[in-house]
């Protein structure tokens, strides 16, 4: 079975051609392939499939085998994958995800895709739709205590749940420990991704992310979008900013006119290979 390892801002996934026959148990396949000691090593797998009403459809599985709604960085890499491999000649694509239809614009240079912009859609602020177990309609700067640490959280869904926390000095905190506790907190019936954000300026935000089902990763596209939305809601940032992640930078814009969030960043092919292991 052929695979392609790709990364966007350090968010690395294994990409599989779903137009060809694949193993039935994709959850187990993701656990095996994603293992960084006994497999290829990745944040998960992404399967590119035919769609009845879009150019392509994606399914993605985290490293622990759980299926996720979508991933912004992965959607950019899908744009590069399908164009560079000749599955399409279009530079504007529609992508079907469990979080709805996403629109991709490909920046092609010398016959290959270098950067991709994604229309990530409208942010969801309604607490029941994120979802969050609360009687409140929205969670904006909501006080939450985690092991004697008091945080103010803002919850946003970009098709998947995110909890954003603003910190002045990230290095003071054990983000792995705190991230895991918040991910599994009773407030979040479907668990949550957790973003830790430090405001460098209204146009530059530093972010680290604890991803649901994976742990800390170098980047998260939907998390970067949710972080900018949360920063704007809390009066900490402009509607267009650069998000500085461990794996690289993403340009994020929350458009005031149409309420949609746009993400732009690189998409990189790391290597390709053949997977011969049984699941």
Language-model segments: residues:
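N-terminal, positively charged, Ser/Thr/Ala/Gly-biased leader segments
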Residues: 1-21, 118, 135-136, 141-156
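A glycine-rich beta-to-alpha transition motif near the start of alpha/beta enzyme domains, typified by
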Residues: 1-112, 163-279
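Generic structural detector for well-ordered beta-strands
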Residues: 105, 119, 131, 143-145, ...
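Membrane helix-loop-helix hairpins that form the core translocation module of multi-pass transporters
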Residues: 115-117, 121-123
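Short, charged/polar, Gly/Pro-enriched secondary-structure boundary elements
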Residues: 124-128
């Amino acid at each position: 079975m052929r695979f392609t390892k790709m990364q966007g801002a350090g968010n690395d996934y294994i990409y599989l051609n779903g137009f060809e026959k694949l193993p039935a148990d994709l959850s187990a396949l993701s656990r095996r392939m994603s293992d960084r000691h006994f497999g290829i090593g990745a944040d998960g797998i992404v399967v590119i499939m035919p769609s009845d009403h879009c150019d392509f459809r994606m399914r993605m599985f985290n490293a622990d085998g759980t299926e996720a709604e979508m991933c912004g960085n992965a959607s950019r890499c899908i744009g590069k994958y399908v164009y560079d491999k000749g599955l399409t000649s279009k530079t504007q694509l529609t992508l079907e995800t469990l979080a709805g239809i996403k629109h991709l614009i490909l920046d092609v240079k010398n016959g290959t895709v270098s950067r991709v912009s994604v229309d990530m859609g409208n942010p969801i602020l309604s607490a029941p739709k994120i979802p969050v177990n609360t009687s409140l309609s929205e969670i904006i700067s909501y006080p939450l205590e985690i092991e004697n640490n008091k945080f103010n959280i803002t919850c946003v869904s970009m098709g998947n749940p995110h909890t954003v926390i603003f910190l002045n000095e990230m290095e003071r905190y054990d983000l792995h420990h705190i991230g895991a506790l918040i991910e599994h907190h009773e407030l979040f019936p479907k668990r949550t991704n957790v973003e830790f954000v430090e405001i460098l300026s209204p146009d530059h935000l530093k972010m680290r992310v604890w991803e649901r089902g994976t742990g800390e990763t170098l980047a998260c596209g939907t998390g970067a979008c949710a972080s900018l939305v949360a920063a704007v809601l809390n009066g900490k940032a402009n509607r267009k900013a650069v998000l500085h992640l461990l794996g690289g930078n993403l340009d994020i814009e929350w458009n005031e006119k149409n309420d949609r969030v746009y993400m732009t960043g690189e998409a990189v092919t790391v290597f390709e290979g053949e997977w011969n292991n049984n699941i």
